[in-house]
């Protein structure tokens, strides 16, 4: 359970706040916690404070339009690389899928918003990028961001480089 927070509450005006009976965490009308809000805003300092106070890095939004979104989805959607890095460092699930109609990963969210650097960051940090990754509508991230083809090409090059350098022996650094 979160302790008292020095981070100022910034729920949207005219939105109702509710306290989850299960977790005791304040949420806005979108079902977002303070960590969701600060991750979406790209407020690195506030995100760090909230995580230091015990906020759940993989908290799921419970609103009707954002069901299952994690703070990482929202940071990716906003293209906030430093916040994404901190969330991943603290254990955020890069493959978390929304539970609404789409079933998006943070990679889908970044691609949809055309946040190329966020896409590059996620792929560079191991985001799952198989040929068949799709949302529940069977759309791959490339469907939302046609500039994403480069990520598939980079993955292919990396795969080829790894297999060429390894040959039939185990991969190890040369002495």
Curated annotation (Swiss-Prot):
Q: Where are the ANK repeats?
A: 30-59, 67-96, 102-131
What is the deletion mutant like?
Answer: Normal hypocotyls length.
Q: Which Pfam families match?
A: Ank_2 (PF12796)
Gene Ontology MF terms in the entry? phytochrome binding
Which Gene3D superfamilies does this one have?
Answer: Ankyrin repeat-containing domain
Whether Ion transport counts among this entry's keywords is no
Keywords (A to Z) from UniProt: ANK repeat, Cytoplasm, Mitochondrion, Nucleus, Repeat
* Any one cellular-component term (Gene Ontology): mitochondrion
Per UniProt, subunit arrangement is: Interacts with phytochrome A (PHYA), both in Pr and Pfr forms.
State the protein's name: Phytochrome-interacting ankyrin-repeat protein 1
Q: Organism, per UniProt?
A: Arabidopsis thaliana (Mouse-ear cress)
Q: Which gene encodes it?
A: PIA1
């Amino acid at each position: 359970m979160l302790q008292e927070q020095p981070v100022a509450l910034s729920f949207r005006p005219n939105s109702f706040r509710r306290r989850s009976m299960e977790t005791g965490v304040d949420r806005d009308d979108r079902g977002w916690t303070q960590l969701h809000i600060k991750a979406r805003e790209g407020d690195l300092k506030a995100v760090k404070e909230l995580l230091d106070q015990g906020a759940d890095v993989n908290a799921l939004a419970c609103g009707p339009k954002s069901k299952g979104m994690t703070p990482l989805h929202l940071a990716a959607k906003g293209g906030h690389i430093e916040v994404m890095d901190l969330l991943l460092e603290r254990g955020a699930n890069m493959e978390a899928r929304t539970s609404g109609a789409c079933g998006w990963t943070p990679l889908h969210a970044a691609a949809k918003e055309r946040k190329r650097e966020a896409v590059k960051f996620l792929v560079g940090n191991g985001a799952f990028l198989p040929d068949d990754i799709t949302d529940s509508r069977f759309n791959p991230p490339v469907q939302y961001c046609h500039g994403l083809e480069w990520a598939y090409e980079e993955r292919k090059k990396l795969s080829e480089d790894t297999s060429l350098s390894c040959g039939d022996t185990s991969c190890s650094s040369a002495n």
